Amino acid sequence: MAVTSTAQACDLVIFGAKGDLARRKLLPSLYQLEKAGHIHPETRIIGVGRAEWDRDAYIKVVREALETFLKEPLDPALWTTLSNRLDFCNLDVEDTEGFKRLGTMLDQQNRTTINYFAMPPSTFGAICRGLGQAGLNKEPARVVMEKPLGTNLASSRVINNQVAEFFNECQVYRIDHYLGKETVLNLLALRFANSLFANNWDNRTIDHVQITVAEEVGIEGRWGYFDQAGQMRDMIQNHLLQILTMIAMSPPADLSTDRIRDEKVKVLRSLRRIDRSNVHEVTVRGQYTSGFVQGKKVPGYLEEEGANKTSNTETFVAIRVDIDDWRWSGVPFYLRTGKRLPSKCSEVVVYFKNPALNLFHDSYQQLPQNKLIIRLQPDEGVEIQILNKIPGLDHKHRLQTTKLDLSFSETFNQQHLADAYERLLLETMRGIQALFVRRDEVEEAWKWVDSIMDAWAMDNDSPKPYQAGTWGPVASVAMITRDGRSWNEVE
């Protein structure tokens, strides 16, 4: 297969090789990169874990994972190529001897080592220390870290300080997989390559913005993790705020890594603080009760296996976000995310202001607003809703909302739309950090989120119940209705 010019020979070391993330996401993504010819012929993939496996045992585990989680049959020729890259190192992250063994396996000149931490953040410090003591932290070595990076600003700083003791910021790749989604990446092109939007992307023309990330699933057996995190920490602090920054950022001087990140940080620093004085006006917490999702009976959050029956952890959050800068002053951003909602979808809806003069007042006291809908999943694409005259001989101008719909899969005729992890893994191999989160981004997001969490805690605020299979508590509808607006109806 042809190798792209940006591919580099590297050693990809996966800590937590037998874990859920590696099996469900990383290995299938590596298979697809192999299929597309993006992996350099000399690149190796080394699984790391405490299991007493040899290379053959690990190869068997990888094959089983691919056969389970790939969405297509395993190609024998591709499998042969991929399996030839595989190796395994038995290692306990607290054992220095294990890192010495890993160092022996990696003892090759002019190769980049990518250390992917597919393990809990509580282990990151020990892994970095082990790599550092074994001399495996020198550039161009890289580390890739998964969320959650802490549970608040203080704990996030502890983790980042542990990593920074052994790795420079230019070596650190913090993953938010939403940044690898094709439609999120398309936001830059949509906004800055098209004069239709580039010249009309501020408070002069935009009325408000809605960002919805909805999940049909519950906690999927992750009670221990989720009850400590909740929807605010699990989704708002990272995914939704990252999407918000991509929508709200000003044009960067160029598309280099730090220019883009600098603009995103400016947005985070401009978020209006939410505290006890306004938290009940602009936020809603919810917790699902039993109900029906897609016609199937599902238990409530407090009825899930292993549940603490007195838990006040939120499974739904809606927030009105105000950005205090010249571009967005007076334009609210409404964020909404939850579990056990009617359907799985992620979308951004930009509502444009109506013309100052309504020439069609005989038919419409208020015109329906033009909308730009950016679908992040499941059917990635962009939809514009505009008004057109309904054909006919009627002397009145009867208008109808018309959709201009661009579906990525149909428009670009691609059988396989690259998964976010495929792109992010490839970017780590290329050494490009633009799609990863810089430390100051993480910490600015935590500052804003912590203020809300503290306000909830001080008021002993309990989440409002909502039935599984509905769009969250009634209070979330009331919050946006008070502003004279309504949530976009997800189709």
From Swiss-Prot:
- The protein's name is Glucose-6-phosphate 1-dehydrogenase
Example of a GO MF term: glucose-6-phosphate dehydrogenase activity
Q: Which organism is it from?
A: Dickeya dadantii (strain 3937)
Q: What keywords sit in the KW lines?
A: Carbohydrate metabolism, Glucose metabolism, NADP, Oxidoreductase
Q: Where does substrate bind?
A: H177, K181, E215, D234, K339, K344
Residues annotated as the enzyme's active site: H239
State the taxonomy lineage.
Bacteria, Pseudomonadati, Pseudomonadota, Gammaproteobacteria, Enterobacterales
Keyword NADP set for record: yes
What is the reaction catalyzed? D-glucose 6-phosphate + NADP(+) = 6-phospho-D-glucono-1,5-lactone + NADPH + H(+)
